[in-house]
């Protein structure tokens, strides 16, 4: 259920819904790809705290995404954010900054969705043997790979198979619950603004900000 876990009884504070948004360029001509590279369809990202990620697509586009859409009070979900928001414009600006060769390319697609985020940003897998209820989730945007691993781990737990998967740290892990509102809204919004400020400061000074450790303690 990930971000929609908020709709289950008693689970409003288990995961918060945070948006991850993406854009895609038109197919780029070969001369532009000669400047960019990515001949092997590599994924790319960097170490900024406001996460970004991208990939060359099979049809020659760049698909590029990141965070930045504001958290909605009370764990709200607004589907309009997924297709049209100022956060998309900021993602496009970041793409142009990171890969200037894309500045003249049309942006043909904008989309997004909500992620399920635990309080400590750590996914978990588990099985309650008394009830037979298993769970897996809190992938924070890494679900394509993590859900596959979680499914195989759950299969071993259900069949009581001891394996290297069932000894992983996320098995049986329980994240603490998110703070009640309005503390949740204040904390997430303030953390996002602090992360943006730290990114700007580190870009300007070319060294780790002293506030980075403060943000890490707040997030975890």
Where are these regions (language model features)?
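Short hydrophobic core segments
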Residues: 1-4, 151
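Active-site substrate-recognition segment that forms the wall
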Residues: 3-31, 35-131, 212-220
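Short beta->alpha junction loops/turns
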Residues: 114, 139-140
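C-terminal lid/capping helical subdomain adjacent to the catalytic/cofactor pocket in oxidative enzymes
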Residues: 129-134, 140-220
């Amino acid at each position: 259920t990930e971000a929609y876990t908020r709709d289950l009884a008693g689970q409003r504070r288990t995961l918060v819904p945070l948006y991850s948004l993406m854009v895609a360029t038109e197919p780029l001509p070969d001369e532009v790809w000669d400047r960019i590279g990515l001949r092997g369809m590599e994924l790319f990202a960097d170490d900024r705290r406001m996460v970004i990620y991208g990939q060359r697509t099979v049809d020659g586009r760049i698909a590029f995404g990141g965070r930045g859409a504001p958290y909605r009070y009370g764990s709200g979900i607004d589907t309009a954010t997924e297709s049209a928001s100022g956060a998309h414009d900021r993602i496009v600006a970041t793409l142009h900054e990171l890969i200037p060769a894309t500045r003249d390319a049309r942006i043909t697609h904008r989309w997004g969705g909500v992620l399920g985020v635990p309080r400590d940003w750590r996914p978990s897998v588990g099985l309650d043997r008394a009830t037979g209820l298993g769970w897996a989730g809190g992938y924070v945007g890494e679900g394509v790979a993590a859900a596959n691993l979680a499914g195989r781990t759950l299969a071993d737990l259900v069949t009581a198979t001891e394996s290297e998967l069932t000894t992983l740290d996320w098995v049986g892990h329980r994240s603490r619950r998110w703070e009640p509102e309005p503390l949740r809204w204040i904390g997430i919004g303030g953390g996002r603004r602090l992360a943006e400020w730290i990114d700007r400061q580190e870009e300007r000074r070319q060294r780790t900000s002293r506030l980075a450790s403060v943000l890490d303690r707040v997030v975890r």
